Swiss-Prot record:
Annotated signal sequence range: none
Record bears the keyword Amino-acid biosynthesis: yes
Major site of localization recorded for this protein: cytoplasm
Organism annotation: Clostridium botulinum (strain Hall / ATCC 3502 / NCTC 13319 / Type A)
Gene3D superfamilies the record matches: Imidazole glycerol phosphate dehydratase, domain 1
Top-level enzyme category: lyase
Gene Ontology MF annotations: imidazoleglycerol-phosphate dehydratase activity
Gene name in the database record: hisB
Positions in coiled-coil regions: none
Enzyme Commission (EC) number: 4.2.1.19
Subcellular locations according to the entry: Cytoplasm
Catalytic activity: D-erythro-1-(imidazol-4-yl)glycerol 3-phosphate = 3-(imidazol-4-yl)-2-oxopropyl phosphate + H2O
Name of the protein this chain belongs to: Imidazoleglycerol-phosphate dehydratase
InterPro entries the record matches: IGPD_sf, ImidazoleglycerolP_deHydtase, ImidazoleglycerP_deHydtase_CS, Ribosomal_Su5_D2-typ_SF
Length: 196
């Protein structure tokens, strides 16, 4: 499958982020956000989605991790949209259920051009490492709205918060992989409207 590479650079008063992704990669990653737990989750997304991701973020972590996490979502969303191009031949939809020990998460994606997000999480701790658990939803929202996708993410059950979030990011990677895969039987885009 041919490469689909996008580079995005974004600088604001709060963050500076540069990224390069290949949607049809091997799951290679080199991710540095300054937030260890977040790096770990993004590495999992890349590996399990077979998406190559190089990303470096410098943010105002002396304030907290909110701006960095959200802006990484913005940049990855923009990268994803750019790499997809005209969306011809992609399957459009992707769904994945991923277990992580006692936890089970699901992510469903529609590369629709209509950004929307639904999250159903019940985390029982406020923080893992240096990352607030509420920022999982902020990241997913920024990703979805900047990529132009509908995204539903849910933790069906679990006790360990690390396991729950890890299952979400693995499921995200796998759902993305399924949605962007191309099918030679699809003529144009997967829509009766003729556009996504």
């Amino acid at each position: 499958m041919k490469e689909s590479i996008a580079k995005v650079y974004r600088k604001t008063g709060e963050t500076e982020i540069k990224s390069e992704i290949n949607l049809y990669g091997e799951g290679k990653y080199d991710i540095k956000t300054g937030i260890g737990f977040f790096d770990h989750m993004l590495n999992l997304m890349a590996r399990h989605g077979l998406i190559d991701v190089k990303l470096e973020a410098k943010g105002d972590l002396q304030v907290d991790s909110h701006h960095t996490v959200e802006d990484v979502g913005i940049v990855l969303g923009e990268s994803f949209k750019k790499a997809l191009g005209d969306k011809k031949g992609i399957k459009r939809y992707g769904t994945s259920f991923v277990p992580m020990d006692e936890a089970l998460a699901s992510v469903s994606i529609d590369i629709s051009g209509r950004p929307y997000i639904v999250c159903d999480f019940n985390f029982t701790v406020d923080k893992l490492g240096e990352m607030d658990t509420e920022l999982v939803e902020e990241f997913l929202r920024a990703l979805a709205f900047n990529a132009g996708i509908t995204l539903h993410a849910r933790v069906l059950y679990g006790k360990n918060n690390h396991h729950m979030i890890e299952a979400v990011f693995k499921a995200l990677g796998r759902a993305l992989r399924e949605a962007v895969d191309r099918d030679e039987k699809i003529n144009g885009v997967m829509s009766t409207k003729g556009t996504l």
